[in-house]
Amino acid sequence: MGWQPTYQTEGHIYAKYILDKMPNAKIGILFQNDDYGKDYVKGLKDGLGSKAANMIVAEVSYETTDTTIDSQIVSLQASGADVFYDVTIPKFAAQAIRKAYDIGWKPTHFLNSVSNSVGSVLKPAGLDASKGLITSEYEKDPTDPTWQNDKAY
């Protein structure tokens, strides 16, 4: 039995939160164009159910070979999205956080658990730029100083 929640399950969790806390959200999605990204998107859409079509205002993808995702972030901002569902690997998560901050786009930002590392994503993006992110965690991040003296390590 695995210990990591499935990507679709995580997407369902975010959908439930959005439906409960932001029922009129306009969601912009950035995802990696492969099974990893598509599983997260499927989980979100399944979790939103019949409301997905009206709530999702933009979906843009990126390839792992892309050098930046700046144009995707600008496109999502232009869509009028006030919720950003960010399904990226760490390199692109840091870029997404930073670019949104630099252009003054301040949606409610959901960051998938794959990319919620303090050391490899939040610090490179800038801790000020990372404030307010919503994510999930099922293990302690060894790069987070919060756990530096934790006896579990």
Predicted regions: what is each one?
Residues M1-I103, T146-Q148:
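Extracellular/periplasmic Venus flytrap/periplasmic-binding protein
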Residues P5, A100-Y153:
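Extracellular/periplasmic periplasmic-binding protein-like sensory domains
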